[in-house]
Structure formats: structure tokens, C-alpha cells
Amino acid sequence: MSVEKMTKVEESFQKAMGLKKTVDRWRNSHTHCLWQMALGQRRNPYATLRMQDTMVQELALAKKQLLMVRQAALHQLFEKEHQQYQQELNQMGKAFYVERF
């Protein structure tokens, strides 16, 4: 074998070894990642439940707040329409009967 062929074979061997090391590192990190995920799932079930409970409470409060905002907007709309209706009746010379106590 010539020196050039030996250097080419040696270079390809070095590339193959580098690729093998990269694959081994990836495999080890993947295994470690899976292990960490499983460990985290086993370690924190109560934290997950607390977060879910907190999310449920926040959603309930958000729904209640949205309901209150919508009710206030509807009340304002009814008041505005009532005022407009009163103005139209006043222009025609009519009025609502308002009982005073």
C-alpha cells in the first residue's frame, strides 16, 4: 500500500470514529434525557396536580370576571337605550309614568 492510500484510509477511519463518538454521545444524552423525564414525572405528581388545580381556579375566576363585565356592559346598553327612548318620547311630547315615593 502506498502512503497516500494509508493516509486516506486513516482519515476515513478517523471520520468513522468521530461519527461513532457523536452517535454514542447522542445516544447517552437521549438516554439521560429519558431518564430525567421519567424521574421528573415520578417526583412531581403533586406539583402537577397543584398546577392543574390552580389552573382550574384561575379559569373559574376568569369566567366569573367575564360574566361580570358582560353584565355591566349589558346594563349600560339598557340604560343608554332607556335614555334614548325617553328623549324620543319627550320630543313627541310624551313621557314615562314614574311613581315617586
Swiss-Prot record:
GO terms for biological process: flagellated sperm motility. GO terms for cellular component: axonemal A tubule inner sheath; axonemal microtubule; sperm flagellum. It is found in: Cytoplasm, Cytoskeleton, Cilium axoneme; Cytoplasm, Cytoskeleton, Flagellum axoneme. Keywords: Cell projection, Cilium, Cytoplasm, Cytoskeleton, Flagellum. Its main location: cytoplasm. Expressed in airway epithelial cells. Microtubule inner protein (MIP) part of the dynein-decorated doublet microtubules (DMTs) in cilia axoneme, which is required for motile cilia beating. PANTHER family: C1ORF189, CILIA- AND FLAGELLA-ASSOCIATED PROTEIN 141. Microtubule inner protein component of sperm flagellar doublet microtubules. This is Cilia- and flagella-associated protein 141. The gene is CFAP141.
